[in-house]
Curated annotation (Swiss-Prot):
Homodimer. Belongs to the class-II aminoacyl-tRNA synthetase family. Type 1 subfamily. SUPFAM superfamilies: Class II aaRS and biotin synthetases, GAD domain-like, Nucleic acid-binding proteins. This is Aspartate--tRNA ligase. GO terms for biological process: aspartyl-tRNA aminoacylation. The lineage of its organism: Bacteria, Bacillati, Bacillota, Clostridia, Eubacteriales. It comes from Clostridium botulinum (strain Langeland / NCTC 10281 / Type F). PANTHER family: ASPARTATE--TRNA LIGASE, MITOCHONDRIAL, ASPARTYL/LYSYL-TRNA SYNTHETASE. Catalyzes the attachment of L-aspartate to tRNA(Asp) in a two-step reaction: L-aspartate is first activated by ATP to form Asp-AMP and then transferred to the acceptor end of tRNA(Asp). One of its GO terms (molecular function) is aspartate-tRNA ligase activity. It catalyses: tRNA(Asp) + L-aspartate + ATP = L-aspartyl-tRNA(Asp) + AMP + diphosphate. Its EC number is 6.1.1.12. It holds the Pfam family tRNA_anti-codon.
Length: 593
């Protein structure tokens, strides 16, 4: 049984002791990292979230404490009182390596069984074990550094927004289901049998209502929930830095957030963000990089060869152009010697993005090698090489198809090759704003338009008339902030006119009745002098991944779910008692074999 503190107070953290503390009598508390018994002396490395302190116990220092210290084992939780002294053999690898603590008194606060994982940096254990024993995994110094970074990030964000006149306000977690996009997590109501709350996918509607209420600068750091298939680096519950402002346009929101990003990345990560951040229209991003989340740390931009081969009789090129598509290519420098097997793998790669194939031209020192050379005239080959600014040693990779297939496949291929060639500077942070997104996308299966972001996004002033005639060409007052090929956050200016909002719902295929059934409270609010407003939300978890230098979202969330949205620690979700279900008016339907 562990000893009680009985009024004993910790006076210093393990990682805080330095030479200027020599001579001080202190009390430290933490976990035993390791113990070394050298006969007349016992050395204990004691760890807390700030670091490690070496403690030395000896018969000459205090016999009782020396004998008691021999009983401690790895991960025992102990308290030690003694004097900080200069270390005879300094350890330059430890921040506290110049000093040690002479252990004069020890309390064993609690014992520990042998841990299923070793508490150290760079743990080599399976993800399932780490998540099952997450409370032990979180003791590791590299994990504790991550959560100190997370804390500091939230503090810097709060301080900055407070200094800029924002109010931190909370919005409901139990809210109304408005199914558009990802599935909602539903919560049954006990008072209203057969009815459900939804957990919010974002605070979107409530923060807009706060603008109507006159709270012109709102923010919160809040949980959001999406019941979707968990691709890499997705979690069913995640955290947003959410904000909304009244009486603003795009430039106002962007300028404020550039200053916020510069402050966060400098103060937390020591990273300089060059301002103003580059802005790139969606159309340019897709045409040059094949993605609305372009990684700008390397070149290999997509080039349009359609004009150069518009008269070609090569049926692959001709067919794509006649069908309204295009012929585009990327250039992989110094890759002309790539073998046939490697190129075959690249062809298989683009087919996963629905491309029918991948044409290639290897520009070698003494020849141009290509399986499509025989289908091209000398002038067409020359035009391609000139357009690609090709030099000896370059490999040109070409896709001819519908534009969306060309963009997606070449964009993915560009990233794939850059990673294979290891040409991405991992120490560089390249921000870019993507602007002028399409407002709508046509869903062929449902035969209707869907909002690219959400149905509350404002329309670019010059495109409003197109909403009636060519909805697919309408651009949104939307903006995403992208860092190194990852979306860090996104936002937009919102519609604040009830008639225009109703029209937007109509274009999306909502009847007036359906729109009012789902969003009537918002449309009603818009009758009472709503201000122009807009905002932005960051994925806090992804931001911390960049600042902490980890590629796994589970590393930055204290108790994450696994890839199947299951918690190995608590075994949630779990079966609940029948009487709980009965109280909620829910009956289980057994699966038929």
């Amino acid at each position: 049984m562990g000893e009680a503190l009985r009024g004993l107070k910790r006076t210093i953290m393990c990682g805080e002791s330095r030479e200027n503390n020599i001579g001080e009598k202190v009390t430290v508390m933490g976990w035993v990292q390791r113990k070394r018994n050298l006969g007349g002396l016992i050395f204990v490395d004691l760890r807390d979230r700030t670091g490690i302190m070496q403690i030395v116990f000896g018969e000459e220092i205090n016999k009782e404490a020396f004998e008691k210290s021999d009983n401690v084992k790895s991960e025992y939780c102990i308290a030690v009182t003694g004097e900080i002294v200069k270390r005879q053999s300094p350890n330059n690898d430890m921040e506290t390596g110049a000093v040690e603590l002479k252990g004069e008194d020890i309390k064993i606060l609690s014992e520990s069984e042998t841990p299923p994982i070793y508490i150290k940096e760079g743990l080599d254990a399976s993800e399932n074990i780490r998540l099952k024993y997450r409370y032990l995994d979180l003791r590791r110094p590299d994990m504790q550094k991550i959560f100190m970074i997370r804390h500091k990030t939230c503090k810097v964000v709060r301080d900055f927004l407070d200094e800029n006149g924002f109010l931190e306000m909370e919005t409901p977690i139990l809210t109304k289901s408005t199914p558009e996009g990802a599935r909602d997590y539903l919560v049954p109501s006990r008072n209203y049998k057969g009815m459900f709350y939804a957990l919010p996918q974002s605070p979107q509607i409530f923060k807009q209502l706060l603008m109507v209420s006159g709270y012109d600068k709102y923010f919160q750091i809040t949980k959001c929930f999406r019941d979707e298939d968990l691709r890499a680096n997705r979690q069913p519950e995640f955290t947003q830095i959410d904000m909304e402002l009244s009486f603003v346009e795009e430039d106002d929101v962007i300028e404020l957030n550039e200053r916020l990003l510069a402050k966060v990345f400098k103060e937390v990560g020591g990273i300089d963000v060059k301002l103003p951040i580059e802005r790139m229209p969606y159309k340019i991003a897709m045409e040059k990089y094949g993605s609305d989340k372009p990684d700008l740390r390397f070149g290999m931009e997509i080039n349009d060869l359609t004009e150069a081969v518009k008269n070609s009789e090569f049926k692959v090129f001709k067919g794509a152009i006649e069908a309204g598509g295009s012929v585009r290519a990327i250039k992989a420098e110094n890759c002309a010697t790539m073998g046939r097997k490697q190129i075959d793998k690249l062809q298989d790669f683009v087919k996963t993005y629905k491309a029918k194939g991948l044409a290639w031209i290897a520009y070698k020192e003494d020849e141009i090698k290509s399986p499509i050379a025989k289908f091209l005239t000398e002038e067409e080959m020359k035009a391609i090489l000139e357009k690609m600014d090709a030099k000896a040693g370059d490999l040109i990779l070409i896709v001819a198809d519908k534009n969306n297939v060309v963009f997606e496949s070449l964009g993915a291929l560009r990233l794939h090759i850059a990673k294979e060639l290891d040409i991405i500077n991992k120490n560089e942070f390249r921000f870019v704003w993507i602007t002028e997104f399409p407002l709508l996308a046509y869903n062929e299966e449902e035969g209707r338009y869907q909002a690219e972001h959400h149905p509350f996004t404002a329309i670019m002033d010059e495109d409003i008339e197109l909403l009636d005639t060519e909805p697919g060409k309408v651009r949104a007052k939307a903006y995403d902030i992208v860092l190194n090929g990852e979306e860090l956050g996104g936002g937009s200016i919102r519609i604040h006119d009830s008639k225009l909002q109703e029209k937007m719902f109509s274009v999306l295929g909502f009847t007036k009745e359906k729109a009012w059934e789902r969003f009537g409270f918002l449309l009603e609010a818009f009758k009472f002098g709503p201000p122009p407003h807009g905002g932005l939300a960051y994925g806090l978890d992804r931001m911390i991944m960049f600042l902490a230098g980890t590629e796994n979202i589970k590393d930055v969330i204290t108790f994450p779910k696994n890839q199947n949205a299951f918690c190995p620690l608590t075994e949630a979700p779990n079966v609940v008692d029948e009487n709980q279900l009965e109280e909620l008016g829910i009956k289980k339907i057994e699966k038929e074999d």
